[in-house]
């Protein structure tokens, strides 16, 4: 991916040149920012004014178990300040810009050359929890797309559905579960969508828990009820069985006493 080029630098109009963020095309970002490869095989790079510390980013990547990372071949992750959607075009800002942030997206997957490059906006979130969760959600969905859903996990999750456990792990899983249990003509299709979504969700939450101490209540969203603690713990333990932790990481579930 190396080489020397002349970059077309664009300035965000509407702000003074001194205060404007510089934007570049994703292909330019790929060419001027060589990737590092973590011990688990994941390729990644940072570009621009990214506030997450380098050692935190390295550990975030290293938390992904080798069995998951091995499914992410020909994929590279770029942690950038802002990934900005400009109609059909995507540009990358070299730092936070309040005007550009209005059209920024959390991430964008783009095929560049023979690899899929994922550009993750770090300055829309600016805290380790949110940045890591965005990365791990992408990893979870990429694994499901390439390797499918574990039969052992699917059996567990569907047993929980049949037992009418409360809540789910994402809006996608919640909506698909409702359709899968409505006994309509497309119930089987929605069941498969539900299992794919819930498996990806469980992977992302598991990875987040390897990197940070995660409180159950930090996972709540307003759009759907969160899966109850006991079935959540069952799913995460199943993921830990399927994808054991890398050396230097631990997976534990602790229960706090109330009162």
Locate each region found by the language model:
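Pan-zinc metallopeptidase signature
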Residues: 2-34, 186-259
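Short glycine-rich, low-complexity/disordered patches
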Residues: 70-80, 149-150, 173-174, 252-254
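Short pre-active-site segment immediately N-terminal to the catalytic Zn-binding motif
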Residues: 118-136, 188-191
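Post-HEXXH active-site segment of zinc metalloproteases
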Residues: 129-133, 145-181, 216-224
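Active-site-flanking alpha-helical
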Residues: 140-148, 204
């Amino acid at each position: 991916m190396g080489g020397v080029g002349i970059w077309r630098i664009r300035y965000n109009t509407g702000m003074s040149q001194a205060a404007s963020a510089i934007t570049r095309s994703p292909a330019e970002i790929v060419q001027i920012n060589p990737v590092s490869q973590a011990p688990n095989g994941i390729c990644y790079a940072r570009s621009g004014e990214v506030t997450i510390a380098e050692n935190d980013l390295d550990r975030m990547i290293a938390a992904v178990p080798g069995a998951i990372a091995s499914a992410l071949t020909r994929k590279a992750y770029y942690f950038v300040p802002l990934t900005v959607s400009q109609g059909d075009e995507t540009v990358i800002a070299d730092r936070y810009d309040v005007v550009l942030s209005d059209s920024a997206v959390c991430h964008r997957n783009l095929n560049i050359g023979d690899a899929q490059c994922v550009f993750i906006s770090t300055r829309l979130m600016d805290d380790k929890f949110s940045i890591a969760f965005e990365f791990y959600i992408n990893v979870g969905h990429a694994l499901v797309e390439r390797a499918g859903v574990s039969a052992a996990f699917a059996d567990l999750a569907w047993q929980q559905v049949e037992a009418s456990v409360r809540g789910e792990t994402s809006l996608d899983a919640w909506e698909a579960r409702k359709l899968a249990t409505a006994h309509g003509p497309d119930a089987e299709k929605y069941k498969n969508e539900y299992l794919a979504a819930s498996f990806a969700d469980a992977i992302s939450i598991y990875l987040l828990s390897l990197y940070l101490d995660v409180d159950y209540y930090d996972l709540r969203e307003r759009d759907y009820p969160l899966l109850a603690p006991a079935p959540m713990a069952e799913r995460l333990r199943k993921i830990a069985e399927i994808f054991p932790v890398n050396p230097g990481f631990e997976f534990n579930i602790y229960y706090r006493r109330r009162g």
